[in-house]
Swiss-Prot record:
Protein's organism: Staphylococcus haemolyticus (strain JCSC1435)
Xref: NCBIfam families: PRK13673.1-2 (NF010195), PRK13673.1-6 (NF010199)
Name listed for the protein in its UniProt record: UPF0344 protein SH1980
Keyword hit for Phosphoprotein: no
Topology term for the membrane: Multi-pass membrane protein
Length: 133
């Protein structure tokens, strides 16, 4: 499940950047925008569902004596939901020809924060590198 989550958010980020760039400031969305947006939404849902499933698994492991870090897990969940919301809002604003570059960069910064939290959490690469779980 962890690999599916990582693959889904990686594809979500790539699709977000491509979809954002497929909206021209003067002409609006290109013909490829609609399928890109639909694929982006599918991968957003897949990312949210797999992340929620990983959260449940970690909470269950913590209740049986292993794991922990409930606060960081909850913060990562909230950041993930905020990333998805910012992706949708920035694309909607760009389609309406409103200022959206600030939201785009806020989304990128929040993606980096969310990924950083994922790296240091119990199933992340840093934790497995040092045998912390």
């Amino acid at each position: 499940m962890l690999h599916m989550h990582i693959a889904s958010w990686a594809l979500t980020i790539i699709l977000y950047v491509i979809a954002f760039l497929h909206i021209s400031k003067s002409q609006g969305p290109t013909p490829m925008f609609k399928p890109l947006q639909m694929a982006l939404r599918v991968f957003m849902l897949l990312t949210l569902f797999s992340g929620f499933w990983l959260l449940i698994q970690e909470f269950m492991a913590a209740s049986h004596g292993g794991g922990g870090n409930h606060m960081l897990l909850t913060l990562k969940m909230l950041c993930g939901i905020a990333v998805v919301a910012l992706m949708e809002v920035s694309i909607a604003k760009r389609k309406k020809h409103e200022a959206s570059h600030g939201l785009f960069w806020a989304t990128i910064i929040l993606i980096i924060i969310t990924m950083s939290l994922g790296i240091i959490l119990p199933w992340g690469p840093i934790s497995s590198l040092f045998g912390i779980s």
